[in-house]
Amino acid sequence: NDSYWEGSDPNIQEYPVFKVDSSTYCILYIKFFTDKLFHSMIFDMASILSKKQQIKGTPGQVYVQLKQMIGQRFTEKYLFYLIMKGILTDKRYQIWTGEQLKQSYGDGMPDMIAIKAQRVFVFEFKDVQLSAKVKESGDFDTIISKINLELVQTEKGKPKGVTQIANVIEKRLEKLLPSNEKFKIYPVLVYTESSFDLEGINYYLNNKFREILSSRNIDDNFCIKDLVLVNLETLFMFDRAFRDHKLKFDVLINDFLSYKTNKIEHGSVPFNKFLFQRGKAKGYFYKSSGIVRET
C-alpha cells in the first residue's frame, strides 16, 4: 500500500518488525530485531533506574553507563573468552587470557594471545557501538572519524584497537617468544558492532595498521600478517563447526588472507562474509551453539 509510508521516513533498524495483520508479523531483518530486543531491554532498565534515582543521570546517560558495565563485566570478562575457548579447540594452542598476561607481564598486553607452533594470534576485543546518529549520517568523514576514535586512537592520543595491537607487537611480544626463532604474527580485532561487517572497514583499518607499523621498530623475526576483523556474534553462530573440527581457526584465517590477494575485488571483502560462506558450505548455518548446550 503506497499510502502506508506517505509522509514518513521508514527505518527498518528502528522498526524491524512489519505488522501484516492483527495476528501476523514479519521480521524484516533478524539482526536488527535481536539488536532492538537487547538494547530496548537495557534502555527500559536505564529508564527505571534513572526514575528511581538508583543511578544518577538521564535515561540516556544511565543507558551508556549500563552498556559500559555489561561490556566490562560480562562481554569482555566472560563471553569473549567463553566463545574463543570453543573456537580455538586444537590442543596444540598455548592460550593466555588478558588477565593472565597482565599478571605475568604487566600492563599493555592484549586481551588474548594464542600460539600454535610458529603462528602467534594477537587478539584485541572491542565492545564498542557506533551511535545511530553516526551510522545514519551518510557522511564518510563523520563515520571514519568515529571509527578512528574507537579503533585507532582517541582525541587525546590514547591507543585503541589497531594501535594497541601494534604496540603489543613492537614492545610486548618479545617477552613471550624465544628470541632466536621466526614467527608469523596474526593481528585479530574482535568486535560486536555489526556495522563493522560492511565491505571496506577491514581494508581501511588494515591500511591504518600498516601505516602505524611502518614507523615502528619491529623484530626481524616477526612476519606480520594483515589485520583481520572478526565479529564475535558470527563466531558464536558457527562455534559448533569449530567444536566439531569442521572449521579450524588458523586455517580459516590463512585461507581468508590468501583469498583477499587472489583478485583485486576480494580486497575489501570482510572476514565475516568469508566465514559465513565456509560455515554454510559445511552445513552449519544456524545450528545451535555448543555454548548454549553447555549452559
Q: Which sequence ranges carry the predicted segments?
A:
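Active-site beta-strand-loop-beta-strand hairpin of nuclease catalytic cores
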Residues: 114-132
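Well-ordered, non-membrane alpha-helical segments in soluble/globular domains
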Residues: 77, 159-170, 206-215
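A short acidic (Asp/Glu
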Residues: 108-110, 194-204
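Interfaces and regulatory segments of ATP-dependent nucleotide/adenylate/phosphodiester-chemistry enzymes
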Residues: 1-89, 207, 215-295
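Short secondary-structure boundary/capping segments
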Residues: 137-141, 201-209
